[in-house]
């Protein structure tokens, strides 16, 4: 299955760019994941982190680490092709599931997901890592996830921030994140029009962000699933771990 879904050229592109598109990789899981998200939104977990814009537009729902209590999410993790694809892309002998993350931008929300890397937020250190960003609704190029090609190879440690722009860790003296939006012409920015069941696979260090959902009618439901490989170790970053450890 991993040979058929993640080819050698895709694995090489993942290593070089830190982000690739996998067409139809999770098409069989669209309906189960949609059902799981409806259950989750009706009964959020303890790690829900939703945002409501100050301008009164629709909310941006987020929730993490629910795969052990939402049956459809557990089935995806244990029976789906994610682990096999992750092993292939990471070049790892094994693949350990790290966590799930649901992101729902309701129609008309003005909230933008700012440019960031995931690695500074996680209680893990891993060169072998991959996130799958799986839309459950059609996603136009204007509202899709965007990734800075090759940014997973940047050597500088960058300062993580909350979505409101404040520092995540007090007294953090690392370099600020570059203003990708202001210098888009200096980077090769990857982004794709996507269908339900497609996926963007990206490295934890890949710089990424996403626009507001400007559609007045269409939701943008996304299920993200994250794996780590053989070299992953626990890293206490001084904050609340995700997943809790």
Model-found features: residue ranges?
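Non-heme Fe(II)-dependent double-stranded beta-helix
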Residues: 1-16, 21-115, 121-123, 160, ...
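Active-site rim elements
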Residues: 70-75, 184-190, 210-211
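Short, charged/polar surface micro-motifs in flexible loops or helix N-caps
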Residues: 82, 92, 107-110, 138-141, ...
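Short, structured patches in soluble enzyme cores that scaffold and shape functional sites
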Residues: 101, 117, 134-138, 147-149
């Amino acid at each position: 299955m991993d040979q058929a879904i993640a080819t050698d050229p895709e694995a090489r592109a993942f290593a070089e760019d830190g982000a690739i598109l996998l067409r139809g990789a999770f098409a069989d899981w669209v309906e189960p994941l949609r059902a799981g998200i409806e259950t989750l939104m009706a009964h959020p977990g303890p790690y829900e982190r939703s945002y409501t814009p100050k301008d009164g537009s629709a909310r941006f729902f987020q929730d993490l680490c629910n795969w052990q209590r939402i049956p459809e999410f557990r089935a995806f993790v244990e029976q789906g092709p994610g682990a096999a694809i992750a092993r292939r892309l990471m070049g790892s002998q094994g693949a350990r599931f790290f966590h799930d993350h649901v992101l729902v931008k309701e129609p008309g929300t003005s909230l933008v997901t700012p440019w960031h890397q995931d690695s500074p937020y996680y209680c893990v250190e891993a060169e072998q890592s991959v996130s799958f960003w799986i839309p459950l609704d059609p996603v136009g190029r204007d509202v899709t996830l965007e990734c800075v090609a090759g940014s997973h190879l940047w050597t500088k440690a960058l300062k993580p921030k909350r979505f409101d722009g404040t520092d995540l860790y007090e007294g953090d003296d690392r370099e600020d994140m570059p203003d990708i939006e202001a210098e888009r012409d200096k980077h090769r920015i990857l982004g794709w029009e996507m269908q339900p069941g497609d996926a963007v696979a990206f490295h934890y260090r890949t710089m990424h962000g996403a626009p507001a959902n400007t559609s007045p009618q269409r939701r943008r439901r996304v299920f993200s699933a994250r794996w780590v490989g053989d070299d992953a170790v626990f890293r206490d970053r001084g904050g609340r771990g995700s997943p809790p450890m």
